[in-house]
A protein has these predicted regions:
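Bacterial N-terminal signal peptides
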Residues: 10-20
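Boundary at the C-terminal end of the N-terminal hydrophobic targeting segment
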Residues: 20-28
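A short, structured beta-strand/loop element
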Residues: 42-78, 82-84
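Consensus positions within tandem repeat domains that build extended binding/scaffold surfaces
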Residues: 99-102, 121-124, 144-147, 167-170, ...
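A recurrent domain-boundary module in secreted/ectodomain proteins
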Residues: 345-362
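C-terminal outer-membrane/trafficking sorting elements
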Residues: 360-409
Length: 409
């Protein structure tokens, strides 16, 4: 009798939802779609049958969908879809988009998207912590904000060539993700895209990537290898420093670097570039740095010394008034000889526990601590000149950094 009542309740709720649908809304294979027949397109909105099957209300009032008359339940046991395949066509309309929060916390274990999908909306697959495999269609262009956040079973992601943009937090908190390869067409990686991907060790950046926002790799403690396509002229990665060469901006410092030497020529330090970095103990800032974005350097508990090469202290905006607040109390600031009084009087800078002068030499004070296995050769300003080098004999005379040591050729 109880089962009959449950079935009757589910049938009634399904009927209610179907009555609530507009003419452009259809249900196919347990998935709810919004169709635009004049344009010949459709997008998923949410899953309906699994809600009834698991006993959750089909039209609960706790969380609205994109459509005013339909709602879905936000709970720890939302649905249990398992293997999900989104169809290519429904009701003669090509499925081109996955709507916002369509499959939020839906118990998906594997995902195959139909070949017509071009856009994955905000939060579309967030909190599917059993999702371990994704097949992306070749025509996909956009992955929205937090689309795969908290998909904790993903270990590797390879994007198709068509993807152009990774939204804010798109793969954040994917705690088992180890390797990520950007598509050959990817242009932009937004802030927090890989935040708290604690096991991410390797990132392969393709030729087309033009912009990486500050904070894209917050708390990626294992990220030590960023391979940049030789044809990419927008970024360099050397000695743990990821630099946008177009804007002269430091984007990220790897968390396996103890002594960070920001390359000469960098003009700006991006938001969260050196952020929650437990390894860094010493930081060298070249005189070329003119601007620090908000929270550019923060929460570095083991940072004990900062060497600032600029003779004039940088003036911080009101928005950046808390710069150095997290580290000043336990840090010594070293400044060029003759500039001590200026730093002691300068707002923000004067908050350091101790400020000392030092005499700068041209080369002798330059050292580096890249990742232990680094066999690449760099110039003293951080430019990569030779990869996987066993010898420097074919390089022109000069001073280089090889395997963490200064070498004169």
């Amino acid at each position: 009798m109880k089962n009959h009542i449950k079935y009757l309740f589910g049938s009634c709720m399904l009927a209610f939802c179907c009555l609530a649908m507009s003419a452009g809304e259809v249900v196919s294979e347990g998935l709810h779609f919004e169709t635009n027949e004049s344009a010949g397109t459709a997008s998923t909105t949410w899953a309906i049958f699994p809600l009834i099957r698991t006993g959750a209300p089909a039209c609960a009032s706790t969380y609205p969908s994109e459509f005013s008359k339909c709602y879905y339940e936000r709970s720890d046991n939302y649905v249990n879809l398992g293997a999900l395949s989104v169809p290519e066509v429904v009701n003669h309309c090509a499925v081109t988009a996955i709507g916002r929060y369509s499959f939020h916390n839906s118990g998906i274990t594997s995902l195959v998207l139909g070949k017509n999908v071009t856009t994955i909306g905000e939060g579309a697959f967030i909190w599917n912590d059993s999702l371990s495999a994704i097949t992306f269609p070749e025509g996909l262009t956009t992955i929205g904000d937090e689309a795969f956040r908290y998909c904790k079973s993903l270990t590797e992601v390879n994007l198709p060539a068509s993807v152009q943009e990774l939204g804010y937090g798109s793969f954040a908190n994917c705690s088992k993700l180890e390797r990520f390869t950007t598509s050959s067409g990817l242009k932009t990686i937004h802030s927090s895209a890989f935040e708290l991907c604690e096991k991410l060790t390797t990132l392969n950046i393709g030729e087309s990537v033009e912009a990486i926002d500050g904070g894209a790799f917050i708390a990626c403690d294992a990220l030590s290898t960023i391979n940049i396509d030789p044809a990419n002229t927008h970024f360099t990665f050397a000695n743990g420093n990821l630099v946008n060469t177009d804007s002269k901006k430091l984007v990220f410092v790897a968390h396996n670097v103890e002594k960070c030497i920001i390359p000469e020529g960098v003009k700006e330090i991006a938001n969260c570039a050196i952020f929650y970095n437990p390894s860094i103990t010493s930081l060298v800032i070249p005189a070329s740095v003119e601007n620090y974005e908000i929270t550019a350097i923060a929460h570095c508990d083991n940072l004990t010394e900062v060497h600032c090469r600029a003779t004039e202290p940088t003036v911080f905006s009101e928005l950046n008034s808390k710069m150095w607040e997290e580290v000043a109390s336990h840090c010594t600031l070293y400044v060029p000889k003759g500039s001590l009084a200026r730093y002691q009087a300068a707002p923000i800078w004067k908050n350091f526990a101790a400020i000392k002068e030092e005499v700068l030499s041209t080369v002798d004070d330059i050292t580096a601590t890249p990742r232990p296995a680094d066999s690449n050769v760099y110039t003293i300003d951080g430019r990569l000149v030779k990869q996987n080098a066993s010898s420097l004999s074919d390089l022109p005379p000069g001073i280089y950094i090889h395997q963490g040591q200064k070498v004169t050729q």
